[in-house]
């Protein structure tokens, strides 16, 4: 008797898994569009009995895929916003935006120039202060020399008269108001920060030592309780008497 299908003479037996792989989800044309992972025929699920069925791995891959999608969307949105800020100004207001931008740039340049000028003025003031201090020092030394010479000449004539007070050149305006230079200010600030850091370091080391000591005591206590509770009876059962003693000790400690 002839077979029911004439074309099925020379073909081998149809296997269920291969048939399903070819024609499931829209047929051959659908499967040809996307790549499919090769899975052995005897493997029903991903993973193994020892490692599990791969649920955690699938979940991780899904989360990673979603995260990458979000990153792509965020990147695309940022690029679009940049293009919009640069190019898509309204035509009737574009000149206003450009003028505002130029004004802001000019203000920034003026601020930079002022900052540079302020630094130069500070340096000039420091140089003038140094020069004034040097001049004051030289003038005071010259006056001291002249005073000593005049005292030596007048001393034999007026030996019984009391010595006159010193001149008031020491209480001048420049000596009363000596500005601290920026270098001295920075040095004082550096010393203060250094002391603060040393104090904080000492506090951190002290806290660390206290923490380590507390952890050590806690571990010793835990080991002692474990050594006490791991004892068993002759039959291999846990010793309830020791557990009751431990509970009593805890209750007494709480009452204290």
UniProtKB/Swiss-Prot annotation:
| UniProt-annotated stretches for the region Disordered | 1-35, 72-190
Question: Bias category Basic and acidic residues: which stretches?
Answer: 89-104
| Pfam families in the record | rRNA_processing (PF08524)
Q: Where is the composition biased (Polar residues)?
A: 136-185
**InterPro entries in UniProt:** Fyv7/TAP26
Q: Which family does it belong to?
A: Belongs to the TAP26 family.
Q: What's the protein here called? A: Thyroid transcription factor 1-associated protein 26 homolog
Protein species of origin = Danio rerio (Zebrafish)
């Amino acid at each position: 008797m002839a077979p029911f299908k004439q074309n099925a003479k020379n073909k081998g037996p149809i296997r269920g898994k291969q048939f399903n792989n070819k024609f499931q989800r829209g047929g051959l044309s659908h499967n040809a569009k996307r790549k499919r992972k090769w899975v052995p025929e005897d493997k029903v699920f991903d993973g193994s009995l020892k490692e599990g069925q791969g649920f955690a791995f699938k979940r991780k891959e899904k989360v990673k895929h979603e995260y990458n999608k979000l990153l792509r969307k965020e990147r695309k949105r940022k690029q679009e916003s940049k293009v919009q800020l640069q190019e898509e100004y309204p035509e009737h207001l574009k000149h206003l935006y450009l003028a505002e931008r130029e004004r802001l740039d000019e203000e920034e340049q003026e601020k930079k120039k002022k900052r540079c000028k302020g630094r130069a003025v500070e340096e000039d003031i420091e140089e003038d202060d140094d020069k004034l201090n040097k001049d004051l020092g030289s003038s005071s030394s010259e006056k001291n020399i002249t005073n000593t010479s005049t005292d030596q000449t007048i001393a034999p004539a007026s030996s019984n008269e009391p010595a006159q007070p010193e001149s008031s050149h020491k209480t001048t305006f420049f000596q009363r108001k000596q500005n601290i230079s920026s270098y001295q200010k920075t040095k004082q600030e550096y010393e203060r920060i250094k002391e603060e850091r040393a104090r904080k370091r000492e506090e951190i080391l002290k806290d660390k030592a206290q923490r380590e000591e507390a952890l050590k005591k806690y571990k010793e206590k835990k080991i002692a309780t474990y050594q006490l509770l791991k004892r068993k009876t002759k039959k291999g059962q846990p010793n309830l008497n020791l557990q009751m003693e431990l509970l009593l000790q805890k209750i007494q400690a709480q009452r204290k």
